[in-house]
Structure formats: structure tokens, C-alpha cells
Amino acid sequence: MEKYHYFTKDGYINTVFRIPGPKGTVEGLGAQGKPVVLYQHGLFDCFAGIINDEEDSLGLRLVNQGFDLWMGNARCNRYSRDHQWLEVDTSKSEVRAKYWEVSFDQMAEFDQPALWEFILNQTK
């Protein structure tokens, strides 16, 4: 599994994980040209639920069928807890509050376009 960070226009640093091929293959090699799938988790979740069971996981089944799987993480979850200019772990409550002021609108406006642009640049 590969781990990448991408930046949003409003400063969040989010994480995306990639599984370009089945277990035991050299990661990153041969992924170019494969069909890309972005699997985005739902509300109050993270990417881990996508690949939690090797036998029944849709994500791993897609990888085994030849897809280049990318798993997005929403801002402010355990895998995407960074920001370019706001400190997450600060004693200043006004700074911490600003970091946590997030909405689905922001995720749609900033996170998804940045994520798609990142994936498209990586898979050209």
C-alpha cells in the first residue's frame, strides 16, 4: 500500500492510500494504464473500512481484478489531521476551533477536486 498527501486550496493536508496491484506484486510497477477507482469512505469513517476483510472487501476484490485502487480520507479524520497554517494540537482554542470548522460543502468544493487532480497527475 502506498501513502500520499495532497493539499487543498483552503490549506488542509489530506491523505490518500493506493493499492496499485495484488498482494505480492511490486507496488507502483505496472499500475500505469490500469483503470482507476477512487473509493471514498462515508460519514464518520476512514479508508480502513474499505479493505478490512481480505475475502469480502470490495476494495481488495477490485485490486485483484486489475484496478488501481485509491482510497480517499476526508479532512480532519485520523489519517488527514494536518493543515498548512492552522495548528491542530494547540492550546489556542480559537485556532483549534477554526481548524474544526468543516462542512460537506467544503469537502465537495476543496477536497474532492484536489484529490482527483492529484490522482490524475499520478496516473498519467
Regions found by a protein language model. Name each.
Residues 7, 34, 53, 98, ...:
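Intrinsic disorder
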Residues 7, 19-21, 92:
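Intrinsic-disorder/low-complexity, polar/charged segments
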Residues 15, 20-88:
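Short, surface-exposed "cap/lid" segments of acyl-processing enzymes
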Residues 90-123:
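Alpha/beta-hydrolase active-site loop
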Residues 1-4:
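Short, hydrophobic/aromatic-rich segments at coil-to-beta transitions
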Residues 9-11:
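Glycine-centered tight beta-turn/hairpin loop motif at sheet-sheet or coil-to-beta transitions
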